[in-house]
Amino acid sequence: MPTLKDIRVRIKGVTSTQQVTKAMKMVAAAKLRRAQERAVMARPYAAKLSEMLGSLSAKVDTSENPLLSGRSEVRGALVILITSDRGLCGGFNTNIIKVAQRVVNNEYGELNAAGRLSMICAGTRGFDFFRKRGYTILKGYPSVFQNLDFSTAQEIAETASSMYLKGEVDKVVVVYNEFKSVLAPVLKAETLLPISSEENEGDRGGDYIYEPSPSAIISELVPKHLNTQVWRMMLESNAAEQAARMTAMDSATENAKELLRTLNISYNRARQAAITKELSEIVGGADALQN
């Protein structure tokens, strides 16, 4: 049975931990508000770019732009994984890494075994996980979310499009957490290249005169579209991470609160038992003196 001193030490340790988790929850909540605002603001712009691209591509031969036309055979693939830099965010990283493993080992298992699958990892957790297991990591961006910048998304998009145009890969997939609500991020494995036919469906109802030609506009629009999509995915992942961390720290704080309640009950019982024992010894000693 633990002594009063042991219980006091545990109470002190749990109280200290509770203060840390409560502070981390508050920090995550503040970061979530900013991250959510950025993600929500990026969505309409990304959606409008996709719509414009779809409207224009309906009026031209998509074979003129290789990024808009798929290939009959996938002989090489690139998987872009977006995770967090830090832990203490529940199953945020574990769940998305499982999705990435499924994509790499199941959907493109033959390409991976043949050495024709590469990865780009944005975020320390995913980078460390796949690097230690010997996967081919073309580029890693550890600690990218410490100072999230559009130039990183642009660099990733340019690398992906360059590899696709050179024929080094025939498919580019992005695996990330999409922010939907605080309690329910959505695990996504989304094709970035080739730009899917669904994205090319845009508004076909309007009849516009384009200056310069639709083909020239598409050539300018496609890189912007790719940059924006990667940036949106990184913002979504960042917001989902902060939401997961806030939820995890809230749960940890509540667990600490419940543990403190149990420890205080144990402490009071142990203290009561010690007092009862002392009283019994005093009474026993007094009886012995009287006899």
From Swiss-Prot:
- PANTHER family (alphabetical): ATP SYNTHASE GAMMA CHAIN, ATP SYNTHASE SUBUNIT GAMMA, MITOCHONDRIAL
Record's function text: Produces ATP from ADP in the presence of a proton gradient across the membrane. The gamma chain is believed to be important in regulating ATPase activity and the flow of protons through the CF(0) complex.
Which CDD domains would you find in this protein's record? F1-ATPase_gamma
Annotated PROSITE patterns: ATPASE_GAMMA
Q: Which UniProt keywords apply?
A: ATP synthesis, Cell inner membrane, Cell membrane, CF(1), Hydrogen ion transport, Ion transport, Membrane, Transport
Subunit details: F-type ATPases have 2 components, CF(1) - the catalytic core - and CF(0) - the membrane proton channel. CF(1) has five subunits: alpha(3), beta(3), gamma(1), delta(1), epsilon(1). CF(0) has three main subunits: a, b and c.
Major location (coarse): membrane
An example of a Gene Ontology BP annotation on this entry? Answer: proton motive force-driven plasma membrane ATP synthesis
Q: What family is it from? A: Belongs to the ATPase gamma chain family.
Per UniProt, subcellular location reads as: Cell inner membrane
UniProt KW Endoplasmic reticulum keyword: no
Q: What's the protein here called?
A: ATP synthase gamma chain
Kindly list the GO molecular function terms attached to this UniProt entry: ATP binding; proton-transporting ATP synthase activity, rotational mechanism
**Encoded by which gene?**
atpG
Please report the record's description of how this protein sits within the membrane. Answer: Peripheral membrane protein
